[in-house]
Amino acid sequence: MRTNSLSFRLIFTSAVVAIVLLVSAAFLLAYLFQSAVERNFDARLRAILDGLLANVELGTDGAPGMEGQIADPRFSIPLSGWYWQVSPPKDKALGELASESSLEKRLVPTDADLKARDVGGVASFYILDSEGKELRAIEQKFNLFGGEDEFSFLVAGNFDELKEEVQAFRRALYGVLALLGFGLLASILLQV
C-alpha cells in the first residue's frame, strides 16, 4: 500500500482519530470515577463530622469536651488512619480533643489545605499521617454554643483503602478500551 494512496490516508486518519478518542475517554472516565469516589468519601466524612459536632460541648472553663462517643470503631484503633480532632484557635490555650486512634499525634494541615472551602465552609484535602498513610480530610470551623471562640473540627479517613479500588477500576477500564481500540483498528483495516 502506497503512503499517498487514498486507502492509506483513510486508514491512517481513522486510526489516529480512534486512538485519540479512546485515550481521551480513558482519562476522562478515570477522572470522573476518582471524583465520584472522593465525593462519596467526603460525604461519609461529613456524616462523621456532624456526629462529632453533636457530641462536643464547651465546659465551664471554655474548653471543649465530649459528651458521647463516635460510633465508628476505627476511631478507637491506634494509628488506623481514621482520626478526628477538635482544636481551639491558635492564639488560645483551651485544650484540644482528639480520637483515641491518634495516640497524641495531631494532624497539621497547611494554610494551603485550608484555603479552598466549599459553600458550607468545608475544606477538603489530602494529608499524610505519622505512619505515612494518605488520608482524605475535611475541616470546618465552628463556634460552639455558649462560646465566642471558633474551633477547628477535622475528620480524616484512610484513603489508601479506596485507592486500591480506584486502581482496579483504572486497570479494567484501560484493558477494555485497549481491546476496543484493537477491534476498531482491525475493522478499519478490513473495511478499506
Could you say what each language-model-derived stretch is?
Residues 2-90, 164-167:
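Juxtamembrane segments flanking the first transmembrane helix
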Residues 13, 132-133, 145, 151, ...:
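Short leucine-rich amphipathic alpha-helices used at interfaces
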Residues 26-36, 171-172, 176, 180-192:
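Cytosolic-side ends of inner-membrane transmembrane helices, especially those
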